[in-house]
Amino acid sequence: MNKGSRDNNHSDRGISVVLAGGGTAGHVEPAMAVADALRALDPDVRITALGTQRGLETRLVPQRGYDLELITPVPLPRKPSKDLLRLPMRVRTAIRQTRDVLTGVNADVVVGFGGYVALPAYLAARGGLTGRRKVPVVVHEANARAGLANRVGARSARRVLSAVPDSGLRNVEVVGVPVRESITSLDRAALRAQARAEFGFAEDARVLLVFGGSQGAQSINRAVSAAAKDLAAAGISVLHAHGPKNTLDLPPADPQAPPYVAVPYLDRMDLAYAAADLAICRSGAMTVAEVTAVGLPAIYVPLPIGNGEQRLNALPVVDAGGGLLVDDADLSGDTVARTVIPLLTDDSKLAAMTAAASLSGHPDAARRVAQVALEIARAARKKAS
């Protein structure tokens, strides 16, 4: 574990913010979006990300140019097991390590996003720096149903922020999900011609974007590829990110038909969003946040596991008219064709969905979380001085 240098001159240094959101992309990406917003608001801010060796943060945080401190992971067992017996020891170890980090960077505020590192971060902040003051906490909940770590953290947090009003946490301020600026600042109309040329689509094409997260989604892959002939016959082009470990069973390409562009992974989601008129995707919190932030209507297919939070994530935009919900069990080639073709061939309906999707987004979420963090940190520092 790296050690930050301790600065005892509390009033003369920049604000020190610790971001606790390691594990999955759904925890790391919002934290990095807030980090970027913090730096834009206060160039002197010191930003430290807290993570574990097993999380995506070991790659994503250094890529974004931020400091990363590693602690022991504290996975919370969903069912009674031997891991549950070892949990108290793991929590104590992680809290001790986290307190060392908070002391080392002289933290002014902890912003937690849930996940493996959030619980020890909340508990360490509540216990205070080694021999010194407590550290105020800001909690952000991205999902429609709050996890255990954030439910614990929210009890003593100075501010509780959420993507939706009914996440199960009390006294929340709804700010949306923080999304990186390269997405929130995207002008789809201005970039459309370049984006479509990049993927080989005609400038006036009707484009369906298909993706299932970084690893793809097998049920979505099967259903959309099964609808390939019907989509082509309707004049619809497809950009399909199927996942690096997956392949698609596509019919032989017809040189006269609109292109079906299949790729393992999309490095430039901004170009993909700009090229598309409609998306088929899962409804994880980050996916819904990005798709609505750019005003792209979507057919959401919630992942059929967990506690149903993916369905809940999509409901606000669906209820607003910016998307549709299709259950994974109902997904088939016929379902895709019957749903997609009427949308992409009806200009007025597509325009209405696009407008509704745009109004459902929260493109300023990262900035709002960053502003709250700085406000809490400055108030705490003023009180301590």
Curated annotation (Swiss-Prot):
Pathway field: Cell wall biogenesis; peptidoglycan biosynthesis
UniProt EC number: 2.4.1.227
Localization of this protein: Cell membrane
BP terms from Gene Ontology: carbohydrate metabolic process; cell division; cell wall organization; lipid glycosylation; peptidoglycan biosynthetic process; regulation of cell shape
Membrane topology category: Peripheral membrane protein
The entry's keywords: Cell cycle, Cell division, Cell membrane, Cell shape, Cell wall biogenesis/degradation, Glycosyltransferase, Membrane, Peptidoglycan synthesis, Transferase
Chief place where the protein resides: membrane
CDD domains: GT28_MurG
Pfam family, one: Glyco_transf_28
Record GO terms (molecular function): UDP-N-acetyl-D-glucosamine:N-acetylmuramoyl-L-alanyl-D-glutamyl-meso-2,6-diaminopimelyl-D-alanyl-D-alanine-diphosphoundecaprenol 4-beta-N-acetylglucosaminlytransferase activity; undecaprenyldiphospho-muramoylpentapeptide beta-N-acetylglucosaminyltransferase activity
Superkingdom field: Bacteria
Residues involved in UDP-N-acetyl-alpha-D-glucosamine binding: T24, A25, G26, N143, R180, S214, Q310
Any single Gene Ontology cellular-component annotation: plasma membrane
InterPro entries linked: GlcNAc_MurG, Glyco_trans_28_C, GlycoTrans_28_N
Enzymatic reactions: di-trans,octa-cis-undecaprenyl diphospho-N-acetyl-alpha-D-muramoyl-L-alanyl-D-glutamyl-meso-2,6-diaminopimeloyl-D-alanyl-D-alanine + UDP-N-acetyl-alpha-D-glucosamine = di-trans,octa-cis-undecaprenyl diphospho-[N-acetyl-alpha-D-glucosaminyl-(1->4)]-N-acetyl-alpha-D-muramoyl-L-alanyl-D-glutamyl-meso-2,6-diaminopimeloyl-D-alanyl-D-alanine + UDP + H(+)
Family according to the record: Belongs to the glycosyltransferase 28 family. MurG subfamily.
PANTHER family linked to this entry: GLYCOSYLTRANSFERASE, UDP-N-ACETYLGLUCOSAMINE--N-ACETYLMURAMYL-(PENTAPEPTIDE) PYROPHOSPHORYL-UNDECAPRENOL N-ACETYLGLUCOSAMINE TRANSFERASE 1
Task performed by this protein: Cell wall formation. Catalyzes the transfer of a GlcNAc subunit on undecaprenyl-pyrophosphoryl-MurNAc-pentapeptide (lipid intermediate I) to form undecaprenyl-pyrophosphoryl-MurNAc-(pentapeptide)GlcNAc (lipid intermediate II).
Entry protein name: UDP-N-acetylglucosamine--N-acetylmuramyl-(pentapeptide) pyrophosphoryl-undecaprenol N-acetylglucosamine transferase
Native source organism of the sequence: Mycolicibacterium smegmatis (strain ATCC 700084 / mc(2)155)
Lineage, highest ranks first: Bacteria, Bacillati, Actinomycetota, Actinomycetes, Mycobacteriales
Underlying gene: murG
